[in-house]
């Protein structure tokens, strides 16, 4: 009996050691500020439930932090950053930039944003040479935010473009927290922080990016069987499918397969 218990303990410990480690890097939105129970409702906590026991998801969010190293609270100067580096995640998900819209930060230091983001990415690559890094387009800021028209709206847009440039320069995976939340400003309880439903949407976005499971083929209702196409006019047909799925598009004269 003792041997069985010992073997079971060793097997359990081995399974824990072999789990894929996911580090969630960010500010108060990642931390779960404003949620009734951040330990179960933050997006990293909900992501853990979605991914299951073969993954270990850790929340390294720090409220008020900036991506900018000259910002009012740089993420790379926080204990959470040092713990994330020590964690050595196999997957690192970064959502930073919301607090950089502060008038203390973006107007004076915007030219450092791309450089500082690349430095952050490089530090995680140094901690784990095989790390898979995802950086996120920013969650929305609702128009009821007190600084929305005095600069925040425009700076938020500029930061989105900078994040897209970082993804291109570094070759990391770009994910989008903005598009799925934008139609629902009411779930941004204080114009910035998502409620539990919003955190679920963020977790679902990361889950799909990690696993390639997007819930099967999804296309706009604009595209239907037997639809009429205008001749001699280019038509872009787009949608979402699970990673690796091949989709067939057929017209009267042609049949095309998407690339795997």
Predicted feature descriptions by range:
Residues 18-24, 29-118, 154:
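Conserved SGNH/GDSL esterase-like catalytic core that processes O-acyl groups on lipids
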Residues 95-101, 122-157:
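Active-site segments of SGNH/GDSL-like serine hydrolases
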Residues 224-257:
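Ser/Thr-rich low-complexity repeats and stalk/linker segments
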Residues 13-15:
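Boundary at the C-terminal end of the N-terminal hydrophobic targeting segment
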Residues 1-7, 255-260:
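Conserved small/polar residues in nucleotide/adenosyl-binding loops
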Residues 35, 138-215:
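Catalytic His-Asp segment of secreted/periplasmic serine-dependent ester chemistry enzymes
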Residues 117-121, 160:
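Generic structural signal for well-ordered alpha-helices
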Residues 213-227:
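Short, compositionally biased P/S/T/A/G/V-rich stretches that sit at domain boundaries
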